[in-house]
UniProtKB/Swiss-Prot annotation:
Position(s), cross-link Glycyl lysine isopeptide (Lys-Gly) (interchain with G-Cter in ubiquitin): K345
Originating species: Saccharomyces cerevisiae (strain ATCC 204508 / S288c) (Baker's yeast)
Sequence positions bearing Phosphoserine: S344, S349, S369
Name of the protein described by the UniProt record: Copper transport protein CTR1
Principal subcellular localisation of the protein: membrane
MF terms in GO: copper ion transmembrane transporter activity
UniProt KW keywords: Cell membrane, Copper, Copper transport, Ion transport, Isopeptide bond, Membrane, Phosphoprotein, Repeat, Transmembrane, Transmembrane helix, Transport, Ubl conjugation
Post-translational modifications: Extensively O-glycosylated.
């Protein structure tokens, strides 16, 4: 019996030592697993986003709960409750700490999201999406260009009106330059690739049958060379055109952005400036056209060669030669012919004593045909002015043909 008691006591000691070994190994395994899990969640918290952190916290909670259940099962099987009770306590405290840290991070993320959404709402509510008379502290075009009282708002109003006048001024200058360059091109033929019809280099061509002079026709230039190989003067003109177009386009787009602020003060400033500047520079165009037409008539009268080849319509027709009239008359009576010759001599002497108007007095009043031609030209000029006033005067259009003649 004593041997059996000793054997049973030895078995109990072996079992207790085995259970202690198993418990200690389980505890060390649980602690290692918890430490590795905590390290994993910390690294994931630092590298992952807010949504990934929330999913990692859920995974950690499930892992900790499964490990706690495993440790509780091992402690009940081994019977060593005291040694295993400390392990769930530490794991619970670690889980509580991690949960609190995760809740803090989630709170920070929610606060950040709420603050950003609040800023977005403030910005969206600060922008105008419809016409409004409110202009106070609303920036237009630039960050510091805003008005907080009526005086500053009126100053911005005048700024946009002046910008509209500058835009129309650039268009008017471009139109004047195009007319001037076109007139100079046609008058002097310096910058044109077209050879003049009256050029001396072309020579003179005669028709032997009809015995009259045929002027040389201009040569047709190469279109590609005119477009891609311009002269230096044409290139200089293109640079001026590019500068004017760039500046005017920039101003009109800035005015468009000002109207997109939906502030009525700025919208009416742009509309008022464009309307007034259009009327003003349209009047300037009409005055310039009238002035150029008068200058053209004066230049034509000064360069007119006189009667016989009159081009201005202000020189009288030459009187018929009395000698030629006397020679054309036919008669059989010799005395009658002599009398006519005497009369013609008397007429010649009287004609020599009289002053020739074209030689001493210059241009007289226009004859009936000249008056009719002048009236026709004036009617054409009035019709052209009416057409220009009724339609939009595009600055890119070439001037009328009446400005291309000398």
């Amino acid at each position: 019996m004593e041997g059996m008691n000793m054997g049973s006591s030895m078995n109990m000691d072996a079992m207790s030592s085995a259970s202690k070994t198993v418990a200690s190994s389980m505890a060390s395994m649980s602690m290692d697993a918890m430490s590795s899990a905590s390290k994993t969640i910390l690294s994931s918290m630092s590298s992952m986003s807010m949504e990934a952190m929330s999913s990692a916290s859920k995974t950690l909670a499930s892992t900790m709960s499964s490990m706690a259940s495993m440790s509780m099962g091992s402690s009940s099987m081994s019977g060593m409750s005291m040694s295993m009770s400390s392990t769930p306590t530490s794991s619970a405290s670690a889980q509580t700490t991690s949960d609190s840290s995760m809740s803090g991070m989630s709170g920070m993320s929610s606060s950040d999201n709420s603050s950003s959404s609040g800023m977005d709402m403030d910005m969206s509510m600060g922008m105008n999406y419809y016409l409004t008379p409110t202009y106070k502290n609303y920036p237009v075009l630039f960050h510091h260009l805003h008005a907080n009282n009526s005086g500053k708002a009126f100053g911005i109003f005048l700024l946009f009106v002046v910008a509209a006048f500058v835009y129309k001024l650039l268009l008017f200058v471009s139109w004047c330059l195009e007319v001037h360059w076109f007139k100079k091109w046609d008058k002097q033929n310096k910058y044109s690739t077209l050879p003049s019809a009256n050029s001396k280099d072309e020579g003179k061509h005669y028709d032997t049958e009809n015995n009259f002079e045929i002027q040389g026709l201009p040569k047709l230039p190469n279109l590609l060379s005119d477009i891609f190989v311009p002269s230096l003067m044409d290139l200089f003109h293109d640079i001026i055109r590019a500068f004017l177009v760039f500046t005017s386009t920039m101003i009109i787009y800035m005015l468009m952005l000002a109207t997109m602020s939906f502030v009525l003060t700025y919208v009416f400033a742009v509309i008022t400036g464009l309307a007034l500047s259009e009327v003003f520079f349209n009047r300037c165009k009409i005055a310039m056209l009238k002035r150029w037409d008068i200058q053209r008539e004066i230049q034509k009268a000064k360069s007119c060669p006189g009667f016989g080849n009159c081009q201005c319509g202000r020189h009288p027709e030459p009187s018929p030669d009395p000698i030629a009239v006397a020679d054309t008359t036919s008669g059989s009576d010799q005395s009658t012919r002599l009398e006519k010759n005497n009369e013609s001599k008397v007429a010649i002497s009287e004609n020599n004593q009289k002053k020739t108007p074209t030689q001493e007095e210059g241009c007289n009043c226009a004859t009936d045909s000249g008056k009719n031609q002048a009236n026709i030209e004036r009617d054409i000029l009035e019709n052209s002015k009416l057409q220009e006033q009724s339609g939009n005067m595009d600055q890119n259009l070439l001037p009328a043909e009446k400005f291309t003649h000398n």
